[in-house]
């Protein structure tokens, strides 16, 4: 898979922290997020899923993710936003790749991306969360175009 190494800015994010199998929690988290965004007139800059664990090492019921939108620096959580977190994704050096997800198969592009990165002679994966930015509305289009971000450091 083709990818590039680039510097990413810090992102302020608001949304929901979920624990459990990603096949369920990401969908559930985005359903909650859409209701919260619509109900509070939040204007998202980006729609993002943040992944904290390696599914090959962590049991499915303990996998952590955030389903969030990026928000401006001065954003405050509206009243009656139970369960909403406001945090950030660290800026820094990331490997990035764009992929199209069809048939809800988000795992395949991620595995392809990681396999490519593991063969890189100059960079290694850093112990920080990975995330994906949604470039379209997959529920309307029938597929998702995503930009994947994996933190890296020089070898």
UniProtKB/Swiss-Prot annotation:
- What broad class describes the main subcellular location of this protein? cytoplasm
Q: Name one GO molecular function term.
A: DNA topoisomerase type II (double strand cut, ATP-hydrolyzing) inhibitor activity
Q: Where in the cell is it found?
A: Cytoplasm
- Pfam families, per database record: GyrI-like
Record's SMART domains?
AraC_E_bind
Q: Which UniProt keywords apply?
A: Cytoplasm, Stress response
Q: Could you give one GO CC term from the UniProt record?
A: cytoplasm
Q: Which HAMAP family match?
A: DNA_gyrase_inhibitor
What family, per the record?
Belongs to the DNA gyrase inhibitor family.
Quaternary structure (record):
Interacts with DNA gyrase.
Q: Per its database record, what is this protein's job?
A: Inhibits the supercoiling activity of DNA gyrase. Acts by inhibiting DNA gyrase at an early step, prior to (or at the step of) binding of DNA by the gyrase. It protects cells against toxins that target DNA gyrase, by inhibiting activity of these toxins and reducing the formation of lethal double-strand breaks in the cell.
Q: Report the protein name in the record.
A: DNA gyrase inhibitor
- The gene behind this protein is sbmC
